[in-house]
């Protein structure tokens, strides 16, 4: 079967994406932001991502057996907005406009319940036959948590938690309160390691063996003017935090920055002052999720756990879940957030139509790829000098070993929020100054933000305390004492790191580069962060990579088989 999964709609949506399954295998998968260059793909159908997916597979809409959408939009409109105003044909015209997707007939359109799409993205691509499912996010159609049992290709819902008790919204509201922004929960997670937990209940949570209760908000509270409870929970949490926390909300202001020569958006206080609140919020989140996980594992009798939903991107929480005594195996897809519901919806419909889903494997590289001719044409348009080294991997390794920052744009682009050796900025993991250099000079961001390492899987058991595959940078683990001092730029305050383990099968060129680096510096480990400027999506095309390379103090760019260098001093 050929099933195109979609996420993204013109009203109040984020993370627009498209995924194409052909006979149960991922043929293409991409985020709309990578094409539009507008981060998070807000309030748009995934037109460009869908066009890429079909082009990648050499298909048209007429070749599709089904289109799947990762929300039950008709139910949401009927419940919240007075009725669903579109026929399936009209909805398809919004999602796949005919001027871009000409067709003789419309394929069947399936609206998949949101948490089922999340569950499918984790379970069907895990390679496991059975396990317990835990979905935690901001909110689906109504629920913010789903507990389910996956077995024999079927997903059975056991329990849900209503949206007013959302852990995802709670974490976003705390992030907003600190001045980090509600759409930057990853920053709050990073800040938490610098703080001290004060009271993990926050005078609002009650934790028990089944998860949590929230004494702050009526679980049945509804927002009559919107289709989720974000505003209801925001008002309640901000009022509560102002009562119990020593600092007021960190307000955003506009001020003139002499260094940048323009008016910028900033906060009245340094968000670092809120580090104890960040640590407390992280502890509360973990306590609640651990209870939910233990509950669904006990109720299903399983020891394999599948996790998805936006909260599933919390790598610190995931790393601790992995080591709980109740968990033997755990799978969190690299697209745990709403990016992944296009893939999950496609999988749910494909299974319904009789397909078996192939495991995801150790890669997220399903985006666009560019030929050497296309890369060379982009280079020629810039007028930059470049060359084609006989051993690109060795030269890049030597640059990293000498303290340079290298842009790396190779193969098919990743999908998801993490750069995984396809569109990455690479630096020395051994340099004591590299973290500050990339944070402050290259990426123009907070000094306390951590960086993650890529390392060969063959040495990860020596570097990390947990011997496991970490292909997606979606779990943290502790670094062994001997390596914590050797790899200062990729080890966080609490001696944790969010590793990517690399095998030859998963990424041959990146594996060769890390091998060469190991020969030069002793450890096949490098700092790996996303290749993007502040506030922008990860680069996709050679033109994106070259533009970002020209704007940022990056020393070299390896794009396809070519190497571009410039003389920038740290």
Curated annotation (Swiss-Prot):
Note: It seems that TobZ plays a solely passive role in the adenylation reaction: all functional groups appear to be provided by the substrates themselves, representing an extreme form of substrate-assisted catalysis. The role of the iron in catalysis remains unclear.
Consequence of substituting residue 14 to N: Shows negligible tobramycin carbamoylation activity
Annotated knockout phenotype: Cells lacking this gene accumulate kanamycin.
Source lineage: Bacteria, Bacillati, Actinomycetota, Actinomycetes, Pseudonocardiales
Similarity-based family: Belongs to the NodU/CmcH family.
Record CDD domains: ASKHA_NBD_TobZ_N
Keyword Glycoprotein: no
GO MF annotation list: ATP binding; carboxyl- or carbamoyltransferase activity; hydrolase activity; iron ion binding; ligase activity
Region: Kae1-like, residue numbers: 1-354
InterPro entries (alphabetical): ATPase_NBD (IPR043129), Carbam_trans_C (IPR031730), Carbam_trans_C_sf (IPR038152), Carbtransf_dom (IPR003696), NodU/CmcH_Carbamoyltrnsfr (IPR051338)
SUPFAM superfamilies: Actin-like ATPase domain
Cofactor note: Binds 1 Fe(2+) ion per subunit.
UniProt-annotated stretches for the region YrdC-like: 367-570
Binding locations of Fe cation: 114, 118, 137, 338
This protein's name: nebramycin 5' synthase
Function, as annotated: TobZ is involved in the biosynthesis of the 2-deoxystreptamine-containing aminoglycoside antibiotics such as nebramycin 5 and 6-O-carbamoylkanamycin. Catalyzes the hydrolysis of carbamoyl phosphate and its subsequent adenylation by ATP to yield O-carbamoyladenylate. Then it catalyzes the transfer of the carbamoyl moiety from O-carbamoyladenylate to the tobramycin 6-hydroxy group to yield nebramycin 5'. It catalyzes the same reaction with kanamycin A. These reactions are considerably slower in the presence of deoxy-ATP.
């Amino acid at each position: 079967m050929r099933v195109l999964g979609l996420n993204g709609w013109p009203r109040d949506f984020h993370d627009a994406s498209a995924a194409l399954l052909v006979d149960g295998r991922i043929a293409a998968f991409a985020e709309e932001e990578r094409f539009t260059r507008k981060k998070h793909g807000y309030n748009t159908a995934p037109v460009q991502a869908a066009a890429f997916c079909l082009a990648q597979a050499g298909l048209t809409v007429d070749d599709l057996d089904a289109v799947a959408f990762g929300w039950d939009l008709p139910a949401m409109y009927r419940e919240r907005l007075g009725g669903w105003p579109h026929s399936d044909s009209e909805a398809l015209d919004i999602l796949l406009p005919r001027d871009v997707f000409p067709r003789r007939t419309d394929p069947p359109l399936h609206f998949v319940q949101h948490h089922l799409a999340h569950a499918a993205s984790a379970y069907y691509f895990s390679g496991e036959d059975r396990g317990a499912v835990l979905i935690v996010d901001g909110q689906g159609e109504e629920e913010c948590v789903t507990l389910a049992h996956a077995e024999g290709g079927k997903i059975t819902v056991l329990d849900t938690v209503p949206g007013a008790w959302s852990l995802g919204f709670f974490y976003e509201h705390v992030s907003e309160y600190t001045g980090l922004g509600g759409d930057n929960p990853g920053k709050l997670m990073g800040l938490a390691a610098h703080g001290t937990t004060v009271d993990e209940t926050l005078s609002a949570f009650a934790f028990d063996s089944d998860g949590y209760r929230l004494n702050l908000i009526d679980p049945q509270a509804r927002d009559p003017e919107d289709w989720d409870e974000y505003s209801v929970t925001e008002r309640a949490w901000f009022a509560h935090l102002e009562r119990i926390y020593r600092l007021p909300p960190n307000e955003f202001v506009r001020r003139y920055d002499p260094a940048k020569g323009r008016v910028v958006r900033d906060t009245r206080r340094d968000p670092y002052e809120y580090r104890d609140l960040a640590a407390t919020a992280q502890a509360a989140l973990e306590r609640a999720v651990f209870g939910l996980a233990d509950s669904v594992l006990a109720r299903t009798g399983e020891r394999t756990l599948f996790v998805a939903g936006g909260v599933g991107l919390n790598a610190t929480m995931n790393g601790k879940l992995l080591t709980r005594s109740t968990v033997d195996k755990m799978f969190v897809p690299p697209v745990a957030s709403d990016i992944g519901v296009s893939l999950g919806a496609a999988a749910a419909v494909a299974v319904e139509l009789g397909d078996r889903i192939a495991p995801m494997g150790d890669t997220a590289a399903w985006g666009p790829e560019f030929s050497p001719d296309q890369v060379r044409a982009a280079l020629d348009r810039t007028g930059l000098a470049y060359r084609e080294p006989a051993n690109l991997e060795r030269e890049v390794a030597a640059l990293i070993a000498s303290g340079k920052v290298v842009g790396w744009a190779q193969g098919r682009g990743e999908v998801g929020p993490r750069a995984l050796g396809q569109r990455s900025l690479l630096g020395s993991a051994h340099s004591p100054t590299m973290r500050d250099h990339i944070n402050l000079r290259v990426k123009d961001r907070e000094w306390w933000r951590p960086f993650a390492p890529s390392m060969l899987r063959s040495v990860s058991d020596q570097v990390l305390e947990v011997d496991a595959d970490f292909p997606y940078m979606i779990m943290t683990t502790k670094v062994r004492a001997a390596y914590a001092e050797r790899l200062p730029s990729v080890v966080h305050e609490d001696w944790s790191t969010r590793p990517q383990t690399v095998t030859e099968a998963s990424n041959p060129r990146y594996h060769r580069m890390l091998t060469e680096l190991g020969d030069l510096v002793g450890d096949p480990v490098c700092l790996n962060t996303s290749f993007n400027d502040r506030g922008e999506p990860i680069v996709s095309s050679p033109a994106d990579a070259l533009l970002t390379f020209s704007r940022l103090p990056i020393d070299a760019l390896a794009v396809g088989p070519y190497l571009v260098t410039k003389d920038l001093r740290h």
